[in-house]
């Protein structure tokens, strides 16, 4: 089942987003394994990222193996605080 993640970074900026994505996504511009959708943009009071993975397991693998270690290590110019997170077991996904 597809799995959706919404991250809201209060006070986040485009520059922080660009630095963070450069650190955790493949350098060729593709999506991480298992991620099938990614969108981001400015939102009220910060920056929001929407991602869809092909399963909760692929999200957890990316989160635990790539995202959290990079963020805990610190990303030069990246987001400085953890996001507000909402996750969704997606019933419907149309492309």
What do the predicted segments below correspond to?
Residues 1-50, 54-69, 77-95:
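Short S/T/G/P-rich N-terminal loop/turn motif that feeds into the first structured element of a domain
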